[in-house]
Amino acid sequence: MKKHLIKLLVLILALATGAAVRAASTLDIYWIDMEGGAGTLIVTPAGESVLIDTGNPGGTNTDSSAARIHKAAVAAGISKIDYLITTHFHMDHYGGAADLAALMPIGEVLDNGIPEHDSDGVTNNDARWTRGIQPYRDFKADSRKVMQPGEVIPLKQTSGAAPLSFYCVGTRQRYPIPSYVPTNVTNPVCAEGVEHPVDTTDNANSIVMLLKFGPFKFFVAGDLTWNMEAKLVCPFNPIGTVDLYQVDHHGLNLSNNPLLVRSLSPTVSVMSNGSRKGAMPETLATLRSVPSIQTMWQIHRNTLGGTNFNTDYQYIANLPVQCEGNYIKCSVDPSGKSYTVSIPATGVSKTYATVLDRPY
């Protein structure tokens, strides 16, 4: 009898500990410090996980991209990546995948299809490209699939929580207009656009995703660059406005076209930058010029400058160059009507109301 009681107490404690890891029925998003790479982990109310990009290669040591993703996954209470989305084939976005697969199982991999030649079309670079991509090609996963525009990730719904959907707005420079988007009136901001030189790198092919949780909307587009950002929302905007904007391309000025940011009109932005990469003054100026944005959050302080390179320091997860790899977290209420962004390591947090009166 005593042994059974002890087992019961252990089970109750384990369940209580698991519940403390992630509040029931919240949608949680983690921006993990990839030291200038990208890695965004989404954990659904049903406990499924979606990882967008895996940072750089670096083995499985404590400070590697894979180890930091694994650490965040453990904090989120998950033991498997159900879906891995690789937005494009640059090393700082796919490089940590093979290392991560050595630490935890990976379910379905979705990407643009592994190129046979250099992803940026660089001539005489095929040998180097082949060596660099081989670990990604070889790592173990349950399945692999080429992402298509309009594709929906079949995430599980949860009783008592808002409806959840996650779909591909576009990829490989194709952005179809959904039938519910009105096409009788063009996007008014498009008239003010300025083109940049054509981007021939794989950045321009980045997968663009939109997450909806009830009224809450989150936009993430890898390293999508200037002209493609304009093409995405002009002449028609298939996305509408969003609550949360993952700043494109680490905050570089090759991206974050004002046409895109103004069309999305986010309430919050989160930037996955490095201490000397991204967070460019032009991007910060664009974000500050958008009236809807209440707070700009950053993974790193940009050491190249002061306020023109950075948001308010309290909203930066890692201030020193030699840092602890702190992440930024967003927890969305089960109703989808409010959400809290925080830096758990510093205790800074801020709660926002979701925009409710959108046409779509």
Residue ranges of model-derived segments:
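Flexible, acidic/histidine-containing loops and adjacent segments that form or flank the divalent-metal
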Residues: 24-27, 94-225, 289-360
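Bacterial N-terminal signal peptides
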Residues: 7-18
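Conserved beta-strand hairpin/beta-sheet module of binuclear metal-dependent hydrolase folds
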Residues: 24-80, 202-226, 230
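Proline-aspartate-enriched helix->loop->beta-strand connector
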Residues: 106, 265-271
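Divalent metal-coordination and catalytic microenvironments
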Residues: 32-33, 42, 53, 88, ...
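Active-site environment of divalent metal-dependent phosphoester hydrolases
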Residues: 36-38, 58-59, 89-95, 115-119, ...
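Metallo-beta-lactamase
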Residues: 81-92, 245-249
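Acidic/histidine-rich helix-loop elements
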Residues: 52-67, 118, 181-198, 249-254, ...
